[in-house]
Amino acid sequence: MIKISYSPYTLKPVQSLNAATAATAREGVLLKVEWNDGLYGFADLHPWPELGDLSLEEQLSDLRMGRMTTQIEQSIWLARRDALLRKEKKHVFDGGEKIKNNYLLSHFQDLKPGFLDGLKNEGYNTVKVKMGRDLQKEADMLTHIAASGMRMRLDFNALGSWQTFEKFMVNLPLTVRPLIEYVEDPFPFDFHAWGEARKLAKIALDNQYDKVPWGKIASAPFDVIVIKPAKTDVDKAVAQCQKWNLKLAVTSYMDHPVGVVHAVGVAMELKDKYGDMILESGCLTHRLYQMDSFAAELSTQGPYLLKNKGTGVGFDKLLEALTWYQLKVR
């Protein structure tokens, strides 16, 4: 038996986070999970209903009824990792290999003169661009990024169509396409259409992961799996990468700083274990929100997230000071 408590929080975006969402406050809960062996650990639960998740209240309601969503299963798995590290008085960053992160550009208006040179000077190699608001302006932005020599990751969040994607890619300047590392979820998963899309760019699978009939495919019509430990079974995703000779990138779920540190910890562990199979991560998403007491404890050095104070995922004093509500299972 485990005992689960939760503490609600609100994150306030600095601006709209992607083409699927408005810049409205986002609700989530931190979870405190306690086991019979006396260990306890912390994790985040931050659903994105806009991208197909059950709502926060639906997931908590399921949990009260004794049912666990995939997200809650992952939260408990992460909390157990945290608990074991707290027992050993170790930090989640202590055992892995340092890993770079891409810079997330959520809006083309962020691209000010000198901005890209500043990123390069800080040590960034790669910019991830949220696509789909205004493809013409975004194409112009990609041209500017390509001129800087930085690699690009394009994320369409499966909101487009094959026809729109093909037209967009074919019309890009010749200087741009060679610097596109991959395109994430170009449109809703379709085995044959994604296979055609691969002729235009390397394709990464992210929020369409559950749409793939893994037991039925004879080949993988994509090159990279992007996993979010907050909602993806990490071991299963790694096994698929090994089976189909794919690369893997770890990203946070644009969630609470607790979730950010968990994601980086997983990325560092995988990089240490699997080497070149693991690409740069995309976990520096805490800066998309207004500063709070948790985000204030996070520091970066260019594309690296630095170790914060505490054991496990850290934040010891802040977590201790929160009000926790026990979740009663019916």
From Swiss-Prot:
Protein family (similarity comment): Belongs to the mandelate racemase/muconate lactonizing enzyme family. MenC type 1 subfamily.
Example of a GO biological process term: phylloquinone biosynthetic process
Pfam families cross-referenced by the UniProt entry: OSBS_N
Enzyme active site: K130 (proton donor), K228 (proton acceptor)
UniProt superkingdom: Bacteria
Protein residues bound to Mg(2+): D155, E184, D206
Catalytic activities: (1R,6R)-6-hydroxy-2-succinyl-cyclohexa-2,4-diene-1-carboxylate = 2-succinylbenzoate + H2O
InterPro entries according to UniProt: Enolase-like_C_sf, Enolase-like_N, OSBS_N
Pathway(s) where this gene product acts: Quinol/quinone metabolism; 1,4-dihydroxy-2-naphthoate biosynthesis; 1,4-dihydroxy-2-naphthoate from chorismate: step 4/7; Cofactor biosynthesis; phylloquinone biosynthesis
Stored Gene3D superfamilies: Enolase-like C-terminal domain, Enolase-like, N-terminal domain
Cofactor(s) listed: a divalent metal cation
Subunit structure: Monomer.
EC code(s) of this entry: 4.2.1.113
Keyword set, alphabetical order: Lyase, Magnesium, Menaquinone biosynthesis, Metal-binding
Protein name per the record: o-succinylbenzoate synthase
One term of GO molecular function: lyase activity
Described function: Converts 2-succinyl-6-hydroxy-2,4-cyclohexadiene-1-carboxylate (SHCHC) to 2-succinylbenzoate (OSB). Does not show N-succinylamino acid racemase (NSAR) activity with N-succinyl-L-phenylglycine as substrate.
